[in-house]
C-alpha cells in the first residue's frame, strides 16, 4: 500500500448519483466502484453494502447516505448515493454531502419520472453546478429511435430547469451489465469508463476554500486594553493577512476596518486561512460595534440581506421536529452561521400549510439583515430546538 500516499496529490471532487427510484442509481454506484476496482483505481463496494447505508445525523436530521470513493487518471472522487427519495431531499437541502457535480440516472425504459424532475429542480435550487446524464437500462430498449427520444426529453428537461441541456454529456449503458462484468475493458464496462471520462472533462475542478474571498463568522468579541477589539471565529474561506482591509457585515450597517493582528493559539501570525480558529485585532472598532452573528469579510465580497427565498426541509416528529403543521405568518428563528435571527415565513401561492417531514419553498423576511449569498445553509429553530433546515435559493432584497 505504499502507493496510497502519493495518490492523494490528485484534485478532490465531490459527486453523487440522483434520479428516480429504481432507475439504477445504486447499481450504477456499485458498477463504478467495480470498474474502478478492476482498473486498480478504487475498491469494489457491492450493491447491498451501498443500499443498507447507515443513517447519519446532520444538524439533527436523520439521513441515510452511502459514501464510496474511486479515482480516475487525474482525480480522486468522493461519491454519495442515498437509498431513499427523502434522504436525497434532506441531503441536498442540508448540504450534508456537498456536490460539485451530479450524475442523474434515467432509465431508458421509463424516461424522466417525477423524482427525476424533483431532483433536477432541487439541484438547481441548492446550487449543484454541473449535471452529467447516465441513460441506464439501454440493453432493454431495442429501438434506437426510442433512445434518441428519451435522451432528447432529458436534455429538454434539464434546459427547462436552467441547466445547459444541449451541452450536457449523456452516456448510454447498462449499470447491471457493467456490474456483472469482470473485465474492465469489456463492452459492458465501456459506458462506465465513458461516464468517468465525462465527469473528468465536464465537471470543473472545484475552487478550494482557501482561494475564495476571505470570510469569518464572528463568534466572540473581546476588548484588549491598549490594543483594541479582537473578534474570534473559524475562518470559513480565504486568507486574512495583517494590514488588510476588512468589512464587518450583517445585523447593523456595514463598517470597514483594518486587521492589525492575527492570533492563533496565543501566537501572533502574519495571516490566518480557511480552517484556522483565529482572533483578529481590528483597528478603530469599539467593543460594542461588533456582535456574534456578523461576519468579517473581504471588502465587497458579501452583502447583507433581509428578504430571500429558500428550499426548506421540515423535520418530522420522529426527528424531534414539530408535531403540527404551520402556515404563512409563522415566526421562528433562523440560525445563520453563529446566531439566531427572527423571521417571518410566507408560503408560495396555493400552498396552504407545511407538514412535519415535508420540503417546501419559503419566502422569508428577517427582522435584521444577515451577510448572505446563494447556497447559504441555515437551521430553523423554535425555542432552541431545530425544526427545519434550509438553503438560500434566491436573494430578494
UniProtKB/Swiss-Prot annotation:
S-S pairs = none
Pinpoint the tr-type G domain residues: 10-207
Q: Name one GO cellular component term.
A: cytosol
Query: What is its EC class?
Result: hydrolase
Where in or outside the cell it occurs: the entry states: Cytoplasm
Summary of the function given for this chain in its UniProt record: GTP hydrolase that promotes the GTP-dependent binding of aminoacyl-tRNA to the A-site of ribosomes during protein biosynthesis.
Q: How does it assemble?
A: Monomer.
Entry protein name: Elongation factor Tu
Q: Please name the source species.
A: Nitratidesulfovibrio vulgaris (strain ATCC 29579 / DSM 644 / CCUG 34227 / NCIMB 8303 / VKM B-1760 / Hildenborough) (Desulfovibrio vulgaris)
